[in-house]
Amino acid sequence: MRISENSNRFCQHFKKGWGSIMDQGKLTRILKSMEEHEVPQMIVSDPVAIFYLTGKWIFPGERLLALYLNVNGNHKMMINKLFPQESDLGVDIIYYDDIEDGVEILSKYVEKDKTMGIDKTWPSKFLIRLQELGGGSKFVNGSPIIDYIRMVKDEKEQDLMRKSSKINDIAMDKIIPWVAKGLTEKELNAKMREIYKELGCEDVSFDPITAYGHGAADPHHVTDDSKGNVETV
């Protein structure tokens, strides 16, 4: 039997444990790093990185989502009108619809005579369009800046990781008795999620892998309806 988990990231976040406005401490660290790397402006499109800064999950699908950061403080967020934001994200939001050229609108706010950082997830169709519009004197990979800042945890993040790890240990203790109750892998998976919710987690960071038998030896096993052959001695 195997229950796959990672104690430092399994419990996504705690109820009321994460804000929904731009984290100024993280933003300051990013802007300082941008200055050090001579990248005065940058486009962040990765929903995970945007959540890291704003505490808000936005999944745009194929549509443009771009957080524009500038060391001069002229920050903008490009969001399609299909994803209206009810809460304050701490940044000016510019909405566009499907009949508008979102990149062209974005290009009106950038500094075209300066280097532009682009993160590693921004689709090429948007990058090429920005290049056509002359949206920067040159384009560089800006992801190492944010990736490094995310790696170095601040005190609040370290505290959350400790709490998450402690909750995870408790969850593992609670799920073990259920292994011998004849549940399918999917049913055990659902029970695992239920336990995390009872312990105060809003959600899991990734889908738990619950596996019996040979599936337990598969590092990427897909949880199914099989049952384990478990005997209590």
Task: Label the model's feature ranges.
Residues 9-21:
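Short, Lys/Arg-enriched N-terminal segments with co-localized hydrophobic residues
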Residues 35-36, 59-60, 69, 108-110, ...:
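Solvent-exposed alpha-helices and their adjacent loops that cap or buttress functional pockets
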Residues 40, 114, 231:
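Conserved acidic residues
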Residues 50-60, 145-146, 183-233:
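Short catalytic-site patches enriched in acidic/histidine residues
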